[in-house]
Curated annotation (Swiss-Prot):
Highest taxon in the source lineage: Bacteria
Protein name: tRNA dimethylallyltransferase
PANTHER family documented for this protein: TRNA DIMETHYLALLYLTRANSFERASE
SUBUNIT field: Monomer.
Organism: Carboxydothermus hydrogenoformans (strain ATCC BAA-161 / DSM 6008 / Z-2901)
Function: Catalyzes the transfer of a dimethylallyl group onto the adenine at position 37 in tRNAs that read codons beginning with uridine, leading to the formation of N6-(dimethylallyl)adenosine (i(6)A).
UniProt xrefs under SUPFAM superfamilies: P-loop containing nucleoside triphosphate hydrolases
UniProtKB keywords: ATP-binding, Magnesium, Nucleotide-binding, Transferase, tRNA processing
One GO biological process term: tRNA modification
Length: 311
């Protein structure tokens, strides 16, 4: 394929969304959100969603497409993102994936195989019950025994993906990492320009702390209250960082100060994991948004796009 694609990745709060808009305006681009939580309606503040009035006329895709009770997966993202890349190229514009969900983005440019297995609801129920009784770390230990490669890549708290991996093994007799590897054998699909934003850790952590404070000021607590009133307490989306802590506060289990502390701490940890993931990919060209302005970085990307006949 000769379809063009620009990707901008990096940890949370590093400036990806603002850079994506600046680049898109210069090159007649459209943005595809590479964030696993911004797909959900009504969850604006806690996901740091770019709101319509902030998009400066740049089309954004895969934002506000699902109700919070609906399931989203890397396989669905892969399918929709590839469809959008094709359509945007056909319109003579350039798709720009902007986000920090590493596996989602890799699934688009590295042809991961997400074979649509049908699963045994009884087996899934047993796994879910075991997780309730013994915690997700117990299932993660099970995964380590049958598929250490997947266990290393899937976080011990990511219950949905742990269960998925155990189901694949139960159903096929092969570890899910086998299907990941099988899907990566094909040649690259796109003409790719791949960029990452980073900055000094102390500065990034300061920005994360300030962002969380702003989320509280903007009304994160009221946003979570509305979601609870709409009946979404048990939805997977409400387990997202920034939401589950406020739910605990509203239920009287922790104080507001404790909730804010946990959100800041866990967001910093999340940013560290994001950087670790992306730094493993040698295709990414890195910019330091703590040392260079987004305008300067935009100019460099536009220059490189011109050299590579993207414009």
């Amino acid at each position: 394929m000769s379809e063009k694609l620009i990707i901008i990745v990096g940890p949370t709060a590093v400036g990806k969304s603002a850079l994506g808009i600046k680049v898109a305006k210069k090159i007649n681009g459209e943005i595809i959100s590479g964030d696993s939580m911004q797909v959900y309606k009504y969850m604006d503040i806690g996901t740091a969603k770019v709101l319509p009035e902030e998009r400066e006329g740049v089309p954004h895709h895969l934002i506000d497409i699902l109700e919070p009770f609906q399931k989203y997966s890397v396989a669905l993202f892969q399918k929709e993102a590839r469809r959008l890349i094709k359509e945007i190229n056909e319109r003579g514009k350039i798709p720009i994936i902007v986000g920090g969900t590493g596996l989602y983005i890799r699934s688009v440019i590295d042809p991961y195989d997400f074979t649509d297995f049908s699963f045994d609801p009884v087996f899934r129920g047993k796994l879910e019950q075991a997780a309730k009784e013994k915690g997700s770390s117990y299932l993660h230990q099970m995964l380590e025994k049958i598929d250490p490669v997947a266990a290393q890549k899937i976080h011990s708290n990511d219950l949905r993906r742990i269960i998925r991996a155990l189901e694949v093994y139960e159903h096929t007799g092969k570890p899910i990492s086998y299907y990941w590897e099988r899907g990566k054998q094909s040649k690259p699909q796109y003409r790719l320009l791949y960029y990452g934003l980073t900055m000094d850790r102390a500065l990034l952590y300061q920005r994360i702390n300030e962002r969380v404070d702003k989320m509280i000021e903007k009304g994160l607590i009221a946003e979570v209250k509305r979601l609870l009133q709409m009946g979404f307490k048990e939805s997977t989306a409400m387990q997202a960082l920034g939401y589950k802590e406020i739910v605990q506060y509203l239920e009287g289990k922790i104080t507001l100060d404790e909730a804010i502390y946990l959100i800041k701490r866990d967001t910093r940890r999340f940013a560290k994991r994001q950087l670790t993931w992306f730094r493993r990919d040698p295709r990414i060209k890195w910019f330091d948004s703590g040392k260079e302005s987004l305008e300067k970085i935009t100019e460099k990307i536009i220059t490189e796009a011109g050299v590579n006949n993207f414009l």
